[in-house]
Amino acid sequence: MDLILWRHADAHPGEADLERALTGKGRRQAASMAFWLEKHLPDSTKILASPAVRSVETASALGRKFKIIPELAPGAQVASILAAASWPDSRQPVVIIGHQPALGRLASLLLFGVEQDLSIRKGAAWWLTNRSREDNHITTLRAAICPDYL
């Protein structure tokens, strides 16, 4: 299974948390990352977004249908994100558009076996792949890309 963790792009501060919209920089970050993702994601990819405006705007940059999942809102628990993604059993790739620190903690758990803080920059995407071999789940990092480098 492929799981792509895409942190929402840069958003305006100081507003009600769920209502914070992307800044001009954030819109550019989202567009850059969406362009890269569009070249690499299969058509069958399932896209799930937090209900926060900044996540919805980030997801919208991809130009594909996506589903808003309340369990991905700021403050999400790692177990809730895994359940929403059907990890590790989904037969199709899944993109999660969400928030720190949950995305970083999820990446840490899948890559290192321990849930701890790991920084994912605004607008960045981490592409994780899980393969099962003889009842072992092996997770590898295929890509970690910041929009600044695109």
Residue ranges and their predicted role:
Residues Q77-V94, A102:
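Internal catalytic or translocation cores that form aromatic/hydrophobic pockets or channels
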Residues V114-T140, P147-Y149:
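Domain-level recognition of soluble alpha/beta enzyme cores
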Residues L3, T45, S90-G98:
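Generic beta-sheet signal
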